[in-house]
């Protein structure tokens, strides 16, 4: 009844429902489709609109190129276009004052958006607090559900960035189930993975990629955690400057800072240790509370837990692999010093160098298999330089 009741001379319109397109008289073929009670009720000269649902696009007058599907969808926009609203109440308050190019799909998706533009909002209640925010992407149930006036965020996943309302363009990216769900004013974070960075509130400049990566840190930043549960327990109380890459890399680190951990289960026992470098599967795998060690290579320094700042350097496959409480050792080469446990102040460079010494110290072995059989169990004070140098020495000093 009263559908398309004003149009006089032009066509290519479809109006189905009480007062659908009632006031349209475009002066040309309008190519509008309105289906539903008072759908497109006030459209006068607007064209190329598709409006389906009771009261869908019912405030449109001259707006063009809009799609509104669902009860009250796009219910306030009058003179502009380029919007897609699919879902009951989606974009129901939008009236941007210009072509807005918003996309909202889902029940009440973007329902509070008034003048914000260029947003993509998909999922029930996704971006439902946005008013003037621009250039956001929110995909998932209640994704980006608190941000109102700012933009340039990407939230993809159930509850992703749900609490964010930074007070400025935040440039956060969160992809995954509840990724970054508690961030409120934190900015410049990149979070990808289920529960990645899900405790962050005001923390900024973090990168967390992987399931439960960086999932305890709340208020601080400048950490990089890449891998399943990487830096899972970290909550330093200050900017941490930790880098952990690998499965469970640095997973138990709590308040340690300035660590670089690369490799599956590398540095996975560290809690409060600082200034360590562990690169390789299992590297520095037992140290918890201390630092100043460098372990590069599979299982390098894997059993070290010195009880003090270690100042050990081990580079090579299984270099220093048996060391427990030794200090101030420099071991470079595969299997160098691989029997050392409590020995200190040793230098071994070359494949298999100082390969039998366990508790002794103050030896210098440079060369393949140099001092390979030496095991003095005291301060050996031996110096051997060259291929196989001192290879026959066992207990000599």
Enumerate the language-model features and the residues they cover.
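Glycine- and small/polar-enriched repetitive beta-structure motifs of secreted/surface proteins
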Residues: 1-397
């Amino acid at each position: 009844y009263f559908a398309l009741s004003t149009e006089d001379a032009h066509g290519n319109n479809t109006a189905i429902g009480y007062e659908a397109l009632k006031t349209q008289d475009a002066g040309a073929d309008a190519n509008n489709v309105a289906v539903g009670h008072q759908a497109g009720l006030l459209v006068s000269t607007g064209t190329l609109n598709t409006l389906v649902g009771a009261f869908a696009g019912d405030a449109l007058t001259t707006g063009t190129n809009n799609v509104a599907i669902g009860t009250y969808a796009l219910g306030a926009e009058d003179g502009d276009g380029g919007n897609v609203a699919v879902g009951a109440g989606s974009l129901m308050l939008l009236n941007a004052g210009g072509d807005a190019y918003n996309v909202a799909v889902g029940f009440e998706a973007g329902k509070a958006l008034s003048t914000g533009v260029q947003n993509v909002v998909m999922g029930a209640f996704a971006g439902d607090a946005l008013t003037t925010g621009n250039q956001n992407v929110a995909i998932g149930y209640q994704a980006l559900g608190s941000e109102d006036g700012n933009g340039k965020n990407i939230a993809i996943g159930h509850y992703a960035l749900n609490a964010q309302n930074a007070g400025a363009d935040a440039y956060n990216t969160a992809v995954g189930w509840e990724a970054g769900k508690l961030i409120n004013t934190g900015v410049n974070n990149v979070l990808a993975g289920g529960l990645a960075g899900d405790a962050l509130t005001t923390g900024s400049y973090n990168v967390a990629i992987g399931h439960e990566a960086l999932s305890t840190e709340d208020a601080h930043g400048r950490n990089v955690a890449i891998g399943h549960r990487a830096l899972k327990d970290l909550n330093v109380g200050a900017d941490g400057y930790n880098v952990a890459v690998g499965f469970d890399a640095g997973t138990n680190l709590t308040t340690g800072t300035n660590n670089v951990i690369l490799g599956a289960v590398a540095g996975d026992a560290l809690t409060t240790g600082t200034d360590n470098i562990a690169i390789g599967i299992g590297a520095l795998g037992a140290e918890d509370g201390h630092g100043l060690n460098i372990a590069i290579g599979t299982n390098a320094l894997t059993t070290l837990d010195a009880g003090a700042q270690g100042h050990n350097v081990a580079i090579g496959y299984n270099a220093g692999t048996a060391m427990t409480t030794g200090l101030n050792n420099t071991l470079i080469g595969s299997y160098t010093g691989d029997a050392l446990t409590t020995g200190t102040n040793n230098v071994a460079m070359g494949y298999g160098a100082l390969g039998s010494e366990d508790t002794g110290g103050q030896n210098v072995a440079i060369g393949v298999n140099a001092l390979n059989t030496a095991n003095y169990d005291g301060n050996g004070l031996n110096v051997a330089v060259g291929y196989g140098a001192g290879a026959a020495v066992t207990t000599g000093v």
